[in-house]
């Protein structure tokens, strides 16, 4: 794990030294001495616009011309236009710096802050850069046994020179705690499905949350049957691995404080069931529990900070497998709410899991607000690509807050429509509703949202986040490698702070 330190006095023991230059290409007053020490290397570089323009995110790694001393590289990072800098951009810049240092095999980095930023305190700037670097340091290579030494290389430490190291370290500790919650979400999402069975996943939740003072209850199939959870149980009945409902309760607020319920889809592996998916890219269905992982990660972050809020998390953990005992297209299931659903497509299973999970959360905990998170539809990826998650809500204020926070932490949401005509499309001839719409390939994400909406009680504020396009990525970003992104943890953690 990357070691991050904040110190008041500069050290010359780091192999790489980072400096920041904006698009005006002017040296900070605190860089003049350093530039002279390195025989004008920084000033010469920024005077040559073919080498460096100062645009945001540009990183230039230059071998030092000094033969003595520990500093082997100067790393010049472009800030762009200071007025356009956001906290999210500063964080991503920290990730880019770490990635370039890793590529150049620089094991220790010193970071010299800039004097040219007036909109952020030096403590805030330093903690954000450190947070981005820490997030970018994540790896999932536990099953790779033949890695070459060069592939194993990782930056060991970052040392940030700041005039208030104690205060900056306090800010970073909170960000580090949140990042570690993101790492749990990434880890469990990246885990192969033959390892993370519903039972194993549930055990990992217990092991991670109980030491933080979170009450965790793991409900098995017998109890779910007694509760009438026919929708969730129907999805998992084709698997030899027993389905689980994991209930997490964090009581950090007063008894009369409102409860926020987070509900996550945890389909450990989704073959599509009898409505079998194509084999191409089916292996990516190990990420179909990304919503549940985001819920667990959020509760880790909230409980770790001991926030004064009441949060409950409910995640349904199932495997959607074909077998002689699997659910069939045309089956009718009775949900915990008493409503019935005709299963016309067994690959539209996530909404069935959520139907019972959101109802359970409302019945037991009487929350003021319910937010469900799910890799629910391929249709949302067609609509929004891999940039935005879809946000459906019955409350404009709730949706606006979520979208605002999403912009702040760079986990973007786009408001999607709800309409009575969409709701009418899931009416069934033989049951209360069907799990797909009656117009093929039409409004798939909206149809799925309306299915869940039928299980939200009157007076409950509700948002549904369809994260199918953003939960995992086939390419690296500034804040992490390809694979599980950990989307939703930072969004929901920040929302909870602001909402309460």
Curated annotation (Swiss-Prot):
Binds 2 manganese ions per subunit. Its EC number is 3.4.11.1, 3.4.11.10. The active site is at residues 277, 351. InterPro entries: Leucine_aapep/pepB (IPR011356), Macro_dom-like (IPR043472), Peptidase_M17_C (IPR000819), Peptidase_M17_leu_NH2_pept (IPR023042), Peptidase_M17_N (IPR008283). Keywords: Aminopeptidase, Cytoplasm, Hydrolase, Manganese, Metal-binding, Protease. Mn(2+) 1 binds at residues 270, 347, 349. It is found in: Cytoplasm. Its main location: cytoplasm. It is an enzyme of class 3 (hydrolase). The gene is pepA. Pfam families: Peptidase_M17, Peptidase_M17_N. The keyword Hydrolase applies. The keyword Manganese applies. This is Probable cytosol aminopeptidase. NCBIfam families: PRK00913.1-2 (NF002073), PRK00913.1-4 (NF002074), PRK00913.2-2 (NF002075), PRK00913.2-4 (NF002077). Its cofactor is Mn(2+). Mn(2+) 2 binds at residues 265, 270, 288, 349. Presumably involved in the processing and regular turnover of intracellular proteins. Catalyzes the removal of unsubstituted N-terminal amino acids from various peptides. Belongs to the peptidase M17 family. HAMAP family: Cytosol_peptidase_M17. Gene3D superfamilies: Leucine Aminopeptidase, subunit E, domain 1, Zn peptidases. GO terms for cellular component: cytoplasm. One of its GO terms (molecular function) is metalloaminopeptidase activity. It catalyses: Release of an N-terminal amino acid, Xaa-|-Yaa-, in which Xaa is preferably Leu, but may be other amino acids including Pro although not Arg or Lys, and Yaa may be Pro. Amino acid amides and methyl esters are also readily hydrolyzed, but rates on arylamides are exceedingly low; Release of an N-terminal amino acid, preferentially leucine, but not glutamic or aspartic acids.
């Amino acid at each position: 794990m990357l070691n991050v330190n904040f110190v008041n006095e500069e050290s010359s023991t780091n192999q790489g030294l980072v400096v920041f230059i904006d698009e005006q290409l002017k040296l900070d007053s605190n860089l003049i001495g350093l530039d002279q020490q390195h025989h004008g290397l920084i000033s010469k570089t920024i005077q040559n616009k073919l080498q460096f323009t100062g645009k945001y995110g540009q990183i230039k790694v230059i071998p030092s011309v000094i033969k003595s001393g520990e500093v082997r590289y100067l790393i010049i990072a472009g800030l762009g236009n200071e007025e356009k800098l956001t906290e999210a951009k500063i964080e991503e810049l920290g990730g880019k710096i770490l990635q370039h240092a890793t590529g150049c095999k620089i094991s220790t980095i010193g970071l010299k802050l800039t004097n040219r930023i007036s909109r952020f305190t030096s403590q805030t700037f330093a903690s954000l850069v450190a947070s981005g670097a820490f997030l970018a340091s994540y790896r999932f290579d536990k099953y790779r046994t033949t890695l070459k030494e060069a592939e194993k290389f990782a930056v060991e430490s970052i040392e940030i020179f700041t005039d208030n190291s104690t205060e900056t370290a306090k800010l970073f500790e909170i960000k580090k705690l949140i990042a570690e919650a993101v790492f749990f979400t990434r880890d469990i999402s990246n885990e192969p499905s033959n390892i993370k069975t519903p039972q194993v996943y549930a055990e990992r939740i217990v092991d991670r949350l109980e030491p933080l003072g979170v009450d965790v209850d793991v409900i098995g199939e017998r109890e779910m049957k007694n509760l009438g959870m026919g929708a969730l149980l129907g999805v998992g009945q084709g698997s030899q691995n027993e389905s689980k409902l994991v209930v997490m309760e964090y009581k950090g607020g007063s008894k009369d404080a409102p409860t926020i319920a987070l509900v996550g889809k945890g389909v450990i592996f989704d073959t599509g069931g009898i409505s079998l998916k194509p084999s191409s890219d089916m292996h990516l269905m190990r990420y179909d529990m990304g919503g549940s992982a985001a819920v667990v990660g959020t509760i880790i972050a909230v409980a770790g900070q001991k926030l004064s809020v009441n949060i409950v998390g409910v995640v349904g953990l199932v495997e959607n497998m074909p077998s002689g005992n699997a659910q069939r297209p045309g089956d009718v299931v009775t949900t915990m709410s008493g409503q019935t659903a005709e299963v016309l497509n067994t690959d539209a299973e996530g909404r069935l899991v959520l139907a019972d999970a959101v109802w359970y959360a409302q019945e037991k905990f009487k929350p003021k607000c319910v937010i469900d998170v799910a890799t629910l539809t391929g249709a949302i990826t067609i609509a929004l690509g891999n940039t935005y998650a879809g946000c459906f809500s019955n409350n404009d204020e709730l949706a606006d807050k979520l979208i605002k926070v999403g912009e702040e932490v760079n986990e973007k949401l786009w408001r999607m429509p709800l309409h009575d005509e969409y709701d009418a499309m899931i009416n069934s001839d033989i049951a209360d509703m069907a799990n797909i719409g009656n117009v093929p390939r039409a409004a798939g994400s909206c149809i799925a949202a309306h299915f869940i909406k039928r299980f939200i009680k009157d007076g409950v504020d509700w948002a549904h986040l369809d994260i199918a396009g953003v939960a995992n990525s086939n390419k690296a970003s500034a804040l992490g490698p390809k694979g599980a992104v950990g989307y939703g943890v930072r969004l929901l953690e920040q929302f909870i702070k602001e909402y309460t």
